[in-house]
Amino acid sequence: MGLSPVNIFKPFGLGRAKAVIAAVSGGSDSLGLLFLLKDYLSTLESPPVLIAVTVDHKLRAESALEAENVGLLCQKHGIMHCVLSWDDPKPAHGLAAAARTARYRLLVQAARDAGAGFIVTGHTENDQIETFLMRKARSGHCEARGLAAMSPRSLLEGSVKLARPLLTVSRQALRDELTRRGIAWVDDPSNANIDYERPRVRLGVAAEADGQEVLEQIAQAGAARERDNAALVEALADPATLGVDAAGMMFLNADCYAALSPGARQLFSGLLASIAGGRRFLPGDGERRRIERMLSGQDAPRRLTVFGALIERGEKGAPHRFRRERRNLPKLDLVPGQHIVWDGRFCFFNSGGRSFEIAPPGRQELIDFLKNSGRDIESRRCEALLISPALYEGGKLASVPFLPGAEWPQGVHIERHFAIFDHVLPGHDFALAQAVEARLGRACAEIS
């Protein structure tokens, strides 16, 4: 008896989508996914359009032919198919991570172009076990949040749902299914290249591990992650816990912070450091412990710079403060019709007809701008403006959007951006992200 497509896919609500993107490389996992998904969608009264997308990473000479063969197989079975290529220059280091980032970027673009609400991938139980073992080796201990491994559901770029329905299905079960159907697959030789981390783990420690024991450890790590998240969600329900100014400086109630468990404190302050610094990931375990010790008064310094964030401990009832440090702030061009993210902290939308450069103002430049406009603001507000974006036109400072009473150029709109949530948001953290956003908001206003 084969696998049940209904049992696998029904919990994900794919039937509500206009279209579904299946990521298909031609390997056994993705082909197993494709044909099980096709069978499931055929049971629906009004099924979404199924589109198979193959990403050619251009890393091997054979990859173009393999992508073409996936297309021929899809054509034979009446499945829409397209190939997307990663044509960018390849990095000398971190190739696997760069390829993964490019792959998801291309898949998200394909989903948006097709109006697809879901991207579905063929990650299996074997991949889940390998992910746990890889992260455990990196973390050095068993308390890391990443040991919850992959979430069955995630949100990509704030709008496209990612589903991993096969995390409880073994690779062998998928191969048995394909064999039963008479469908051949291709083994990517890079999956056996021990220069890469995952193949090294797959052929080494994963081959010797007790799979059931690892899955139990994943469940335990997931439960611990949920407990820490729930503690923060509960704390954030109180409006007094967390505040923010227009430039993104956050104020954390010291008493609320002290009332949390050490693990929840490390998560909370690490999360705020990531948001303040515009980073996509939490600081490492050691960095999070260092922040927590400083804010709890266990370590002497009252200020700490971590992950691009400047963190200051509040004294005598004052809140702890988190803001961007004034280093490595970017300069970006904003042309008509463009939507860009600046410094991982702000989204700019330009629906007007003018082009600008976005950059932080220099101190003297800001002082002169304030003087020429007849404004005088206190030092604290000036410091906040120095880590905020300003708009330049023709090389001249044209607008300081967060200055009290400032007028934004026509057609320019700014929103707050949370890099840690807005690119890849694991399902583990949906409730936490909603609670944080409810406190911090997206709207930007003047610094007052």
UniProtKB/Swiss-Prot annotation:
Keyword tRNA processing in annotation: yes
Residue positions binding ATP: 25-30
SUPFAM superfamilies: Adenine nucleotide alpha hydrolases-like
Chemical reaction(s) catalysed: cytidine(34) in tRNA(Ile2) + L-lysine + ATP = lysidine(34) in tRNA(Ile2) + AMP + diphosphate + H(+)
Signal sequence, renumbered to the chain: none
MF GO annotations: ATP binding; tRNA(Ile)-lysidine synthase activity
Gene3D superfamilies: HUPs
EC number: 6.3.4.19
Subcellular location: Cytoplasm
Location (main, coarse): cytoplasm
Highest taxon in the source lineage: Bacteria
Keywords: ATP-binding, Cytoplasm, Ligase, Nucleotide-binding, tRNA processing
GO terms (BP aspect): tRNA modification
Gene Ontology cellular-component annotations: cytoplasm
NCBIfam families referenced in this protein's UniProt entry, alphabetically: lysidine_TilS_N (TIGR02432)
Function: Ligates lysine onto the cytidine present at position 34 of the AUA codon-specific tRNA(Ile) that contains the anticodon CAU, in an ATP-dependent manner. Cytidine is converted to lysidine, thus changing the amino acid specificity of the tRNA from methionine to isoleucine.
UniProt free text on domains: The N-terminal region contains the highly conserved SGGXDS motif, predicted to be a P-loop motif involved in ATP binding.
Protein family membership: Belongs to the tRNA(Ile)-lysidine synthase family.
Protein name according to UniProt: tRNA(Ile)-lysidine synthase
Gene: tilS
